[in-house]
Design a protein with these regions (language model features):
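N-terminal binding-site loop/beta-alpha segment at the start of enzyme catalytic domains
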Residues: 1-71, 192, 256
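Beta/alpha (TIM)-barrel catalytic core signal, keyed to glycine-rich beta->alpha loops juxtaposed to Asp/Glu
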Residues: 111-273
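A structural motif
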Residues: 42, 100-103, 134, 158
Length: 273
């Protein structure tokens, strides 16, 4: 089994560069799927309050036989849980659902600029970090304007920003902002929900390397220094998505994938929340 490379977050905590996401996995399928992922070698599991499957993720983690300290568990607070006290309560609910003593990473799922409470919410996450309830704190779907406010008005720079990112939406400007401020970039929908598998460039590279289109795209993420959290409920695809460490894309092939940028989103823009 290949070891997953790790990246070091800005507070020294290490995170696997490839994780397993459980978005839209029904609760009745989640425990099995997460167990399959852990058996395949994944050590990072990403869930959220919104997904309604935290309890099943926790059950799979507990039943895996893998020591807790070898697993990296992420969850996120939802939009109706913004505010200092509300965020603290949301964390305790999620920790209770997961059945874990601590979390590895806790994220604000969306900035919700119309609500404008993400700064006080972030201050609650800072308290959770200082209390030792979570090893690292970060955000999701934040734009530079949102990140800049957190940096200027609070004490801790987010360790990570989880954003939609794939070859059609490479997010170069946001990635540059992250790099300048020591914020790790994590990709949700790293495979663009499968919409690029028939793309001629991706399909051609899959033939060239004898790999699946998904493996080509995931390899692109890894070689660019992005953390990727693909999701699948199919055991064979869960395993195939993990099998991306035995080859490397040539520099010109990375460049060819970089040219596929169309600024296409498969999900919502943060300003629309």
């Amino acid at each position: 089994m290949d070891a997953v490379p790790e990246l070091t977050l800005n507070n020294g905590v290490r995170i696997p560069q490839l994780g397993y996401g459980v978005y839209k996995l029904p609760p009745e399928e989640t425990e099995r799927a997460v167990g399959t992922a852990i058996e395949a070698g994944y050590r990072s599991i990403d869930t959220a309050k919104l997904y309604r499957n935290e309890r099943e993720v926790g059950k799979a983690v507990g039943a895996s036989g893998v020591p807790r300290e070898e697993l990296f568990v992420t969850t996120k607070l939802w939009n109706d849980e913004h505010g200092y006290e509300a965020a603290l309560a949301a964390f305790e609910r999620s920790r209770g659902e997961l059945g874990l003593d601590y979390l590895d990473l806790y994220l604000i799922h969306w900035p919700v600029p119309s609500l404008d409470r993400y700064v006080e919410t972030w201050k609650a996450l800072q308290k959770l970090l200082s209390d030792g309830s979570v090893r690292a704190i970060g955000v999701s779907n934040f734009q530079p304007v949102h990140l800049r406010r957190l940096i200027e008005q609070t004490e801790i720079v987010p360790a990570l920003n989880q954003i939609e990112l794939h070859p059609q939406l490479p997010q170069e400007e946001l990635r540059a902002f992250h790099a300048a401020h020591g914020i790790a970039t994590e990709a949700w929908a790293p495979l663009a929900r499968g919409s690029m598998f028939s793309n001629s460039t991706i399909a051609g590279l899959a033939r060239k390397y004898g790999r699946t289109p998904a493996q080509i795209i995931l390899r692109w993420h890894l070689q660019r220094g992005t953390i990727a959290i693909p999701k699948s409920a199919t055991p064979s695809r869960i395993a195939a998505n993990f099998d991306v460490f035995g080859f490397e894309l040539a520099a010109d092939d990375i460049a060819a994938i970089n040219e596929l940028d169309t600024n296409h989103r498969t999900g919502l823009h943060p300003d629309g929340m």
